[in-house]
């Protein structure tokens, strides 16, 4: 009989969190949800608490925590409601927890994910920033405390499934020639470059294959998402940048591939649904039903591949440059991107200004080593401050109106 796993889901109201709970609900008795966490989505958290009855619920925002507590009390639930980053760390390291789904988007997910690593948990990692910003710190912590890690990103999960079962971090010793990291190319893969200057947030968030949150949808449109995944792959699989090849694959059916020295290429295929990697990681080394439909190869009919265009997708180039530089630069890249995407979604800069802001912040930041979490978080804070300064210098303020993009912000000018 399969042992019941006790779960904390960090970021339960986001797309990954909801997909995780969908899979969990299909297997009653196999998983017990001990803690759910969110930022400020009280309504969705309330619904999840009603369905799963977790002993703990954490809202990062204190006011949202108060609202949730009132609603749960009125509903007769005895779920304990906590708030703040320290509470996220607490529920990620509870002694009764064995598995943590790390699905908080952004730098806010680093501290609770590290807390899970320090207490030897089985970590299902969907938070890119933990590896992008603090890869060395996080991997060292995993080893030191004998925590285990399985990737949730569909691409890294596909790579994991395509590597030898007992892969020990030695690609060459395992006969691996290179990793082929697939990318859909996003909604603007074939759009005229001039049109990109007028792209709206709604257009950028309309991914052709995947259903995702707004931030990651914009990252997919700029291919920064793929750039961050290159950095993740470096840490997850001990791969130098030259061994990680990005391949644009518009159908999003092949989720990634591993090429071996004998010429073999192993790939993981499936419908574009995050429940597949989630179910794989939740049940590993077994397999279980995810709710995902079978892949109809006759309906797919064809598989296309293209090389990425750095002119169209400068964010991908910037990610490779940050990885090559090392030290604080991946954290700087990530912080500048988070600010740029935030202000783009707010309508304050054009789509084409996102890579301009990121590159300017990177160029104005001195490369430094970051041996610990404090150094990583400091690099993050400083890069965000630099990005805000850049924004202040490049946005014209109009009385009574939101800031308007300056004409000089377009990448083509």
Curated annotation (Swiss-Prot):
Q: Which residues does the record give as 1-deoxy-D-xylulose 5-phosphate binding sites?
A: 128, 154-155, 184, 207, 220, 225-226, 229
Q: State the protein's purpose.
A: Catalyzes the NADPH-dependent rearrangement and reduction of 1-deoxy-D-xylulose-5-phosphate (DXP) to 2-C-methyl-D-erythritol 4-phosphate (MEP).
Report what the protein is called.
Answer: 1-deoxy-D-xylulose 5-phosphate reductoisomerase
**Where is Mn(2+) bound in this sequence?**
153, 155, 229
**What is its pathway?**
Isoprenoid biosynthesis; isopentenyl diphosphate biosynthesis via DXP pathway; isopentenyl diphosphate from 1-deoxy-D-xylulose 5-phosphate: step 1/6
User: Has UniProt tagged this entry with the keyword Metal-binding?
Assistant: yes
The organism of origin for this protein = Nitrosomonas europaea (strain ATCC 19718 / CIP 103999 / KCTC 2705 / NBRC 14298)
> Which Gene3D superfamilies does this chain map to?
1.10.1740.10, NAD(P)-binding Rossmann-like Domain
- Give the highest taxon in the source lineage: Bacteria
An individual GO BP term? isopentenyl diphosphate biosynthetic process, methylerythritol 4-phosphate pathway involved in terpenoid biosynthetic process
According to the UniProt entry, the coiled-coil residues are: none
* Enzyme nomenclature, EC number: 1.1.1.267
Q: Where does NADPH bind?
A: 13-16, 40-41, 127, 129, 213
